[in-house]
Swiss-Prot record:
ATP binds at residues 32-33, 74, 77-79, 140-142, 183, 193, 230. One of its GO terms (cellular component) is cytoplasm. Homohexamer. Forms an RuvA(8)-RuvB(12)-Holliday junction (HJ) complex. HJ DNA is sandwiched between 2 RuvA tetramers; dsDNA enters through RuvA and exits via RuvB. An RuvB hexamer assembles on each DNA strand where it exits the tetramer. Each RuvB hexamer is contacted by two RuvA subunits (via domain III) on 2 adjacent RuvB subunits; this complex drives branch migration. In the full resolvosome a probable DNA-RuvA(4)-RuvB(12)-RuvC(2) complex forms which resolves the HJ. This is Holliday junction branch migration complex subunit RuvB. GO terms for molecular function: ATP binding; ATP hydrolysis activity; four-way junction DNA binding; four-way junction helicase activity.
């Protein structure tokens, strides 16, 4: 039986959260994951560049240059890493920045790589400084420099490594140190998806899950998925549950709308937490500007939750502005709630 991961937040995971909520969800994601660049939907610019770089590396018989994938969570960075390894015809070893606590943890991974293999480090911005220092010569010269022993008896040992490709993924490229960032020869930013591509992704997932779904049903799910495939696939599974009970398993536009409305996800992809925040700015503070601490106190959320979880999507979609004087609701926010626009 699969166990749900412990979440750091005290509140339940939002259905529109871009992070993976549980081990079971991660397992389902893997089942829906495309296996080749041709199957990968969206991110056309990144795909085109990677296809050329991969073909060139294979033609020369070399390891692919180190790759940095960055962008918001849930856009397919892990999927792309697996696809790159498959397209290269090599093995992939996967880990994450917080797991690599000591230099020996990284050394154990690197010394077990075969020539041209891919090492994928998720959340690479969370590498400890000591591990990052060990990584530099490995990336530049395919060599490990490690210290054995302590005090006067300590000595440096150099270990040659096979040529390999590091793929780093991060949601916070700005937190990478300059020396680490400069060692990536290929840098790709993943963007939020257009509704058109999300509709295709939802339709593909429905086929893999053997669901009876109309084009309108796929479009309804896509437009509420906040530009994020992970959210789209999660909403699809919840709509499937609703359709199984209410409509003999058939998902059309009306069923998708009813299911998502029941889940409090509106037509713009906003959930209860988003609306609670915007309504506080609009009704309690006259649309702003208002300081972050005041809004946090008004809605009973921490400032960290507001900055990291609530605000990014609202700003990206044009519902909110951050100004030197505080947060301000935009014209789009007024219109969304049917309020007269403040002049």
């Amino acid at each position: 039986m699969l166990q749900t991961d412990n979440l750091t937040a005290a509140q339940p995971q939002r259905i529109v959260a871009a992070q993976t909520a549980s081990a079971q969800e991660e397992l389902l994601e893997r089942a829906l994951r495309p296996k080749t660049l041709d199957d990968y939907i969206g991110q056309d610019k990144a795909k085109e560049q990677l296809a050329i770089f991969i073909q060139a590396a294979k033609k020369r018989g070399e390891a692919l240059d180190h790759v940095l994938l960055f962008g918001p969570p849930g856009l397919g960075k892990t999927t792309l890493a697996h696809i790159i390894a498959k397209e290269l015809g090599v093995n992939l070893r996967q880990t994450s920045g917080p797991v690599l606590e000591r230099a020996g943890d990284l050394a154990a991974l690197l010394t077990n790589l075969d020539p041209h293999d891919v090492l994928f480090i998720d959340e690479i911005h969370r590498l400890s400084p000591v591990v990052e220092e060990i990584l530099y010569p490995a990336l530049e010269d395919y060599r490990l420099d490690i210290m054995i022993g302590e005090g006067p008896a300590a000595r440096s040992v150099k270990i040659d490594l096979p040529p390999f490709t590091l793929i780093g993924a991060t949601t916070r490229a700005g937190m990478l140190t300059n020396p680490l960032r400069d060692r990536f020869g290929i840098v790709s930013r993943l963007e939020f998806y257009e509704n058109r591509d999300l509709t295709t992704i939802v339709s593909r997932s429905a086929q893999l899950l053997q669901l009876d779904m109309s084009e309108e049903g796929a479009e309804e799910i896509a437009k509420r998925s906040r530009g994020t495939p992970r959210i789209a696939n999660r909403l699809l599974r919840r709509v499937r549950d609703f359709a199984d009970v209410k409509n003999n398993g058939t998902i059309d536009g009306g069923i998708a709308d009813a299911a998502l409305s029941m889940l409090d996800v509106d037509a713009q992809g906003l959930d209860v937490m988003d609306r609670k925040f915007l309504e506080a700015v609009l009704h309690k503070f006259g649309g702003g500007p208002v300081g972050l601490d005041n809004v946090a106190a008004a809605i009973g959320e921490s400032t960290d939750t507001i900055e990291d979880v609530i605000e990014p999507y609202l700003i990206q979609q044009g519902f909110l502005q951050r100004t030197p004087r505080g947060r301000m609701a935009t014209e789009r926010a007024y219109l969304h709630f049917g309020l007269p626009v403040e002049k």
